[in-house]
Amino acid sequence: MGLGRRAMVYLGLAEEDEDYLDDDDYDDGRAVGHDDRRAMHEPVPMDRTVRRIDAREEPVAMPRRPPVEPLRPAGPVPMRRVMPVEETHPYRITTLQPRSYNEARQIGEEFRDGTPVIMNLTDMDDVDAKRLVDFAAGLIFGLRGDIEKVTNKVFLLSPHNVEVTETDKRRIREGGFYNQS
């Protein structure tokens, strides 16, 4: 029986010829001329039970395993750490009114040190003001902070661990919040 025919029989696509015995390339390990009379008289038991599967039968239910839970989350879990200002030390808000883009470093250093910054861009031309807002947006993204537009060309930059109270935000909008540093 050829390889293709054996594969078809194995997959159930063809029936095996019972009267055809393929003994090509078969070596039973006995020496030539060895006479084993018992092997010649005892039939070899073969299980040739073939069962047709009925499409109407219910599938056999496999035992279910409990769902596997990962040891750690699959991805980063965003968490915002907020220190309530009233319960900790009072924070200071720095107000900076840059006149050119060259003063961006001072804004970045104050914010990086954990100080909320009011960035007042009213004295800047629109091109430099836009560049400074872009800088602040990158700063906020990189240090996981928050930015709010207070009024036209005035922004509040809050570090990730500081929450500016609504009272202070209202004072900033009204223009009565001055540099507390």
From Swiss-Prot:
Places the protein is found: Cytoplasm
InterPro entries in the record: Cell_div_SepF, Cell_div_SepF/SepF-rel, SepF-like_sf
Keyword presence, Transcription regulation: no
Protein name, entry field: Cell division protein SepF
Organism in which the protein naturally occurs: Frankia alni (strain DSM 45986 / CECT 9034 / ACN14a)
Record has Cell division as a keyword: yes
Alphabetized UniProt keyword annotations: Cell cycle, Cell division, Cytoplasm, Septation
The protein's role, per its UniProt record: Cell division protein that is part of the divisome complex and is recruited early to the Z-ring. Probably stimulates Z-ring formation, perhaps through the cross-linking of FtsZ protofilaments. Its function overlaps with FtsA.
